[in-house]
């Protein structure tokens, strides 16, 4: 057997040649994790050491997940969608992306899920790009003060708690008090601006349904279609049957779609119906992921959940296009308790609230706005001149009426001034009633509120207030130019008031009450007022 000799020079030469000719493999590498446990919309995943917070992950069946908890040994993942097919041992892969949704005008008139996928059976949506869900809100220097009105078409709100473009106005109240009805009426009222074709007036609307019944969402869509409002509205639907993950991200999806329009100089109205359901979904996710519970078992960052969402609603500066996104968050209370955790959180974040009282709703006062607790902190600067002039005393008159009404229940005798105040308050309360899906124009609101606050209805039976108002508006529309003048100037001058006073008095003379009696008794003509003397006949005279 030949002796083996090792030559170091030969070995060194062979290694050098190998290193020079070596080419790394082009095969891509990918981190792979495995499902340790799964259930209730949550999965615990091992592996994936490079995973980032809020990164999108994909499961074997294509379902997406959101990396929520980054623990030492595993990742807590919120499953976005159906979680029944996810089982222990399945592979999980990173995407290297954060959650985003498609955006663009193609979303107008469509119903989508929280991932931006159409669910209305009308085909694919033509998009203009994507926008991440966790987008930063505009900073202070890029905001413009709220100074443009956003009319709801509801007399009680536009007169007493006005809303401006870029404002966050909370709608709060017990279940079945008309919260959604106010939001839908506000969307329908934007139709007049949309049909004008003026981009500065047009408002694109987004309705985010969180935790609602599927039949309720379908009913809202049908109402918007019948009113012709669906062409400028997008519905983001996350019904009660959806997973907690979908309910959690749905408001952020709607906000991302709206921000795309806002930063392009357009005006947006977004309704979150409702944030109580989103907070409950976030609570269930946090408890399943073993995050420490706080007050009412909500996690400690539930305030941040809503603040980072609602702070995106703003009117941006002219440098960024001058667009706006107005937010109408809805929160449900229990037994009219506005001091609960979520209501107080959202009240402190928003620019005002409209509180709907269940007692008023049950007494057929609809919209059931509680004047005493409802407020708009910044909307007054955006209110039109005309409406501001006529509604100055309305809120205080109604507040005094409420307090005097409770006192009058125990008082046997009232002075004339108190009786007059009670009478005026009762007529104003009746005047502010408004059926659903019948928004008023700004000029109609001005005339109605003026007539109520100036005693033009004080001598009417309560049941005739609304018929009188309807007849008065028809009379003014067909016989005068007063409504047109108010609409074009957005002001209520002394000359306009004098002409309106004369026209309303003329209508009062023609109005007949439900009892069949004229409101104003006609005075008999003067030529018939002098008595006719009988001719005297004296006997014996010729």
UniProtKB/Swiss-Prot annotation:
GO cellular component terms, A-Z: plasma membrane; proton-transporting ATP synthase complex
Region of interest (Disordered), ranges: 518-542
Alphabetized SUPFAM superfamilies for the sequence: C-terminal domain of alpha and beta subunits of F1 ATP synthase, N-terminal domain of alpha and beta subunits of F1 ATP synthase, P-loop containing nucleoside triphosphate hydrolases
UniProtKB keywords: ATP synthesis, ATP-binding, Cell membrane, CF(1), Hydrogen ion transport, Ion transport, Membrane, Nucleotide-binding, Translocase, Transport
Pfam families assigned: ATP-synt_ab, ATP-synt_ab_C, ATP-synt_ab_N
Top-level enzyme category: translocase
InterPro entries documented for this protein: ATP_synth_asu-like_sf (IPR023366), ATP_synth_asu_C (IPR000793), ATP_synth_asu_C_sf (IPR038376), ATP_synth_F1_a_nt-bd_dom (IPR033732), ATP_synth_F1_asu (IPR005294), ATPase_a/bsu_AS (IPR020003), ATPase_F1/V1/A1_a/bsu_N (IPR004100), ATPase_F1/V1/A1_a/bsu_N_sf (IPR036121)
Lineage: superkingdom: Bacteria
GO molecular function terms attached to this record: ADP binding; ATP binding; proton-transporting ATP synthase activity, rotational mechanism
Binding locations of ATP: 173-180
Entry membrane topology: Peripheral membrane protein
NCBIfam families assigned to the protein according to its UniProt record, in alphabetical order: atpA, PRK13343.1
Protein name from the UniProt record: ATP synthase subunit alpha
Lineage: Bacteria, Bacillati, Actinomycetota, Actinomycetes, Bifidobacteriales
Gene: atpA
